């Protein structure tokens, strides 16, 4: 396949056209008065969204050189979304500003590599300044404010996320699903829940709810199948004498063993429920170990030399309550040692950091949440499917933003944190005029987000930036929703520092590479016109031959 090569200003001009098309489409969504973007789908209704990365992902340009620029900036949005879960529009705007300013300096004859060194030095300096100015999140009100800002001013979403985080903790799992109805609601499962129900409906204790509920039960964890209860008789007698119920979790309970348990339950001799162990293969072993640590018990496994006939009551786990329905089992308030549970959580966290598989990471995080606190589900409602999807995008962004805020703290919102951080660049010392130009262009680019927020609100960004830089209060900012200057912390207009920092870091990383680009190579486009001409010329003659079919003896 033949290639086309472009050099110098011709290459950079094509690249910038692509950057502009993508960034200009994404940046209309920024701020409280940002607009929506409608995306056509090959099936079903179009998608309406304000999520920067969702918009960026849909853009592919026909011109291959322009498309290269667009794809590089798309990478900025994707990377920021991956790391911080929000701030994708800000990252895209910063990348566009750095590229456009950088290319101006390079076109004017400055050395691209030195300009990039200046950009890198400035970004590191600003990141340090942002982290130094961050405040720790103190209460659920601040969590709710972060969620509200990220959900485009929707207080209901902000409050719901704050409530969910309060219930399950920062380590807990919060998932977002589409609801069946119009209302958005929060469903919290406390304790450890896994997707295995009772093995027989005869275990039910609450006929109205079709559930088994046991108070203060012993929990037997067995790795293999139970087919015969003979080895367990001494243990079962000890449980009956203790006057407490029993929950059995094993690979399976079948045949005679299950029948014996059911008969004992029906006769009233033993309150019992049997469920299958969660997961498969190695994951099942890990989850049984998790339950053992949570409940203060031991997994009965012949691998470690423990036989069923030798099990004592001290080998069993226990908890405050278990609740089992036909699909799920929930263990509430396990009696395991707190120090052991924390050590297990730390071990799983380490595995999360080491794994390269997204699927494994998700499963490990689920295990961590079940050990650490619980699971909350936010069910997003709406009048139409399109509205539900748009709302779900905002809930996911808000959820990611609140997690980031809890992790690293918060700074003033509305683009002001970057604006004030740009002032710290006055003290940064670099070598040579070309590197100074790199620092200067970052200082200018840091104004781009607040200018875009004000532009989307129909206000002149230069006036707002000028007013804010004239005064000395670093908490002051511009409330674009109400068009007034306010104390941003007092008004609850705040951003997670992790989101702002990641947006700048990723934008500068890709933009710096684009600024240093001197040549671009792409496949030569097919000459469609000549191909089509050949076809049309050949057709009549070919078709004419078919007239001979009339002479066939049919």
Curated annotation (Swiss-Prot):
Keywords assigned by UniProt, alphabetized: ATP-binding, Chaperone, Cytoplasm, Isomerase, Nucleotide-binding
Main location: cytoplasm
GO-annotated biological processes: protein refolding
Alphabetized Gene3D superfamilies for the sequence: GroEL (3.50.7.10), GroEL-like equatorial domain (1.10.560.10), TCP-1-like chaperonin intermediate domain (3.30.260.10)
Pfam entry (one): Cpn60_TCP1
Binding residue positions for ATP: 29-32, 50, 86-90, 414, 495
Any one of the GO CC terms: cytoplasm
EC numbers on record: 5.6.1.7
Enzymatic reactions: ATP + H2O + a folded polypeptide = ADP + phosphate + an unfolded polypeptide
InterPro entries linked: Chaperonin_Cpn60_CS (IPR018370), Cpn60/GroEL (IPR001844), Cpn60/GroEL/TCP-1 (IPR002423), GroEL-like_apical_dom_sf (IPR027409), GROEL-like_equatorial_sf (IPR027413), TCP-1-like_intermed_sf (IPR027410)
Quaternary structure and partners: Forms a cylinder of 14 subunits composed of two heptameric rings stacked back-to-back. Interacts with the co-chaperonin GroES.
Function description: Together with its co-chaperonin GroES, plays an essential role in assisting protein folding. The GroEL-GroES system forms a nano-cage that allows encapsulation of the non-native substrate proteins and provides a physical environment optimized to promote and accelerate protein folding.
Family: Belongs to the chaperonin (HSP60) family.
Protein name as it appears in the record: Chaperonin GroEL
Gene source species: Pelagibacter ubique (strain HTCC1062)
Gene from which this protein is expressed: groEL
